[in-house]
A protein has these predicted regions:
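A helix-coil-helix interface module used to build multimeric assemblies
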Residues: 1-144
Length: 144
């Protein structure tokens, strides 16, 4: 995890956060989740009869991990909106889907659902560690 985009950066991270937890809240995980949500949205809309081409869906799936955060920052300076910056960036990476990315969605759909997914992943990580801790304490208690 040497790529700075693969870890959440905060002054207290090095002191208190594990690498796994930093990864959960990293920019690449957050913005990759945005793209996966847009893909799920487009797939659902296509199933409901909205004209979304297979080519558009294929391009979106192929570009899900193609994150150029420098270019996203340029778009964000231009639009002054983080979600719209990434809509345009994803459209650059999946040109056939440019007109349908984020179709019918709000920024809250993307941001709120991403937060829920990342917090769920973080809680699963915590749960795993708590279970290990309880098992170790139980073994220690039985031994002593």
């Amino acid at each position: 995890m040497d790529n700075p985009l693969d870890r959440y950066v905060h002054p207290l991270c090095d002191r208190y956060a594990s690498r796994e937890m930093q990864s959960v809240f990293s920019p690449s995980r957050r913005f990759g989740t945005w793209r996966r949500l847009w893909i799920a949205l487009a797939e659902s809309e296509a199933e409901l009869g909205i004209p979304i081409s297979a080519e558009a869906l294929d391009e979106m799936r192929a570009a899900v991990n193609e994150l150029d955060l420098e270019k996203a920052a340029e778009y964000e300076r231009r639009f002054r909106h983080d979600v719209m910056a990434h809509v345009h960036l994803f459209g650059d990476d999946a040109p056939a889907a440019k007109g349908i990315i984020h179709l019918g969605a709000t920024s809250a759909f993307i941001g709120d659902n991403t937060d829920l997914i990342l917090h769920r992943d973080a809680l699963e990580l915590i749960r795993t560690r708590v279970v290990r801790c309880v098992e170790a304490l139980s073994a220690f208690a039985e031994e002593h």
